[in-house]
């Protein structure tokens, strides 16, 4: 039996400014590490921002409704 923990996905939030966490082409491994450090299962660079999969349900992600950029 496989248990799926957290299924939210979205852009990684830069808490310092409320924007999406920026990235450049070729920085997928960096985004993957950053996403995992914020409780996501994996991530990649969806230029120009890091996109993460498998956030836990209580994780904070970038949200268009509260966008401050």
Curated annotation (Swiss-Prot):
This protein's record includes keyword Membrane: no
Annotated localization: Secreted
Spans through the membrane: none
GO CC aspect terms: extracellular region
Molecular function terms, GO-annotated: sodium channel inhibitor activity; toxin activity
Signal sequence residues: 1-7
Domain LCN-type CS-alpha/beta as annotated: residue spans: 8-69
Main subcellular location: secreted
InterPro entries: LCN-type_CS_alpha_beta_dom (IPR044062), Scorpion_toxin-like (IPR003614), Scorpion_toxin-like_sf (IPR036574), Scorpion_toxinL (IPR018218), Scorpion_toxinL/defensin (IPR002061)
UniProt-listed SMART domains: Knot1
Family the entry assigns: Belongs to the long (4 C-C) scorpion toxin superfamily. Sodium channel inhibitor family. Beta subfamily.
Note, other: Negative results: does not affect the cardiac Nav1.5/SCN5A, the peripheral nerve channel Nav1.7/SCN9A, and the voltage-dependent potassium channel Kv1.5/KCNA5.
Free-text comment about domains: Has the structural arrangement of an alpha-helix connected to antiparallel beta-sheets by disulfide bonds (CS-alpha/beta).
Protein name as catalogued: Toxin Tz2
Organism of provenance: Tityus zulianus (Venezuelan scorpion)
Lineage: Eukaryota, Metazoa, Ecdysozoa, Arthropoda, Chelicerata
């Amino acid at each position: 039996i496989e248990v799926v923990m957290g299924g939210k996905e979205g852009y990684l939030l830069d808490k310092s400014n409320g924007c999406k966490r920026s990235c450049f082409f070729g920085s997928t491994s960096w985004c993957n590490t950053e996403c995992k450090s914020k409780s996501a299962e994996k991530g990649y660079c969806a230029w120009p921002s890091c996109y993460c999969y498998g956030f836990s349900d209580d994780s904070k992600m970038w949200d268009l409704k509260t966008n401050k950029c």
